[in-house]
Amino acid sequence: MGTQKVTPALIFAITVATIGSFQFGYNTGVINAPEKIIKEFINKTLTDKGNAPPSEVLLTSLWSLSVAIFSVGGMIGSFSVGLFVNRFGRRNSMLIVNLLAVTGGCFMGLCKVAKSVEMLILGRLVIGLFCGLCTGFVPMYIGEISPTALRGAFGTLNQLGIVVGILVAQIFGLEFILGSEELWPLLLGFTILPAILQSAALPFCPESPRFLLINRKEEENAKQILQRLWGTQDVSQDIQEMKDESARMSQEKQVTVLELFRVSSYRQPIIISIVLQLSQQLSGINAVFYYSTGIFKDAGVQEPIYATIGAGVVNTIFTVVSLFLVERAGRRTLHMIGLGGMAFCSTLMTVSLLLKDNYNGMSFVCIGAILVFVAFFEIGPGPIPWFIVAELFSQGPRPAAMAVAGCSNWTSNFLVGLLFPSAAHYLGAYVFIIFTGFLITFLAFTFFKVPETRGRTFEDITRAFEGQAHGADRSGKDGVMEMNSIEPAKETTTNV
């Protein structure tokens, strides 16, 4: 195999794809800053329509619906990934669903002019559908066009897009930018611009060569794209690996969601995929951001929103750090380090929150714990669950696996958002003990069950799971440790 290079074509394609990740992050964070203003809009709109102000219960319910329906859309969208990528391809799917982003952005951006709360809620649902689809499309596309030796580093760019989106939403949400009573519809409707930008750029990006060869049997086209993306003429080994996978796929029928759980060679990787997604959402990261503003205020920070933005900057910085570490330390190691560090920090947060009224310095200890907690999240549990799913499966089951994993992520996100406020009300600072328990459980699971995928081709990983499943069927034993001991594929020299 020839020396692979990080070419401008590869960087361009990955950058354009991560606009979808940015959209997910932006629309996740954008609703928080203008909460008070949007509640006033809902109150005024319903008062004008009904000639009487709505009850506090109705007002709170409509606001909660505006926030939560985004996750409902995400669940539906993420579960629909396979319907698009198998029919239209990876690139074309990203292009088509930008129609949803424009539609959702228009609904949200025009809801104030139309004096329609329904448009706001419908817009959040549609943009949730779009973001749910993006959480499947982007990691899949990046994983399939990246050289094996850099697949993890480029996969981390998906998470970088998400955290940059959240940070931009926090900054744009400041009152003197777009978070004012007059401009908040533009804040929500801004999502149209990245959609237009991505739609204009995607036609200049190649389709996934794996999709072209394995799904469409276009070997010559796939070969030319690989040569252009990787900057080498000798891609024969990669083409042969795809052809072998294509031959295996031709002997199998299309994999359904139920078959992921029924077939022994798919069962373990799909369980690993789901648990890793749960480890992200049940880590307590959203709870920490929920608490952060109040904690910063208690510590004497005059404008806690700026401290929250500071946490967002830490978020971004350590995602970049993870980008450089993931191909050196490996996915499994970084995920365990992240989970272990977060467990320690969540314990420290519980102690400092309980003692902050008695000891002045404890508020600052808690702030430090929050920032380090966020840093550990972005080292492992933030980026790794998104792209490792694409690594654990071959071309046939990959779309169904991405759909199941994405849906489990969105569902757990929805449940945490639904249940956390009540848990925080009844448990107070002790609520973080729950997350500590989850983190320790996920750490143990990762140690015993999750294989290292660094430096392995998709074919290597798939064959390892198949061998493990056959061995388990014969002996009744679990073969995970054998998989963890497999040597990575011979690494290709990669020039930047």
Curated annotation (Swiss-Prot):
The modification Phosphoserine is found at residues 475, 485. It is found in: Cell membrane; Perikaryon; Cell projection. It catalyses: D-glucose(out) = D-glucose(in); D-galactose(in) = D-galactose(out). InterPro entries: Glc_transpt_3, GLUT, MFS_dom, MFS_sugar_transport-like, MFS_trans_sf, Sugar/inositol_transpt, Sugar_transporter_CS. D-glucose binds at residues 159, 280-281, 286, 315, 378, 386. Residues 33-64, 112-118, 175-183, 291-304, 353-363, 421-429 are extracellular. Deoxyglucose transport is inhibited by D-glucose, D-galactose and maltose. Galactose transport is inhibited by D-glucose and maltose. It holds the Pfam family Sugar_tr. PANTHER family: SOLUTE CARRIER FAMILY 2, SOLUTE CARRIER FAMILY 2, FACILITATED GLUCOSE TRANSPORTER MEMBER 3. NCBIfam families: SP. This is Solute carrier family 2, facilitated glucose transporter member 3.
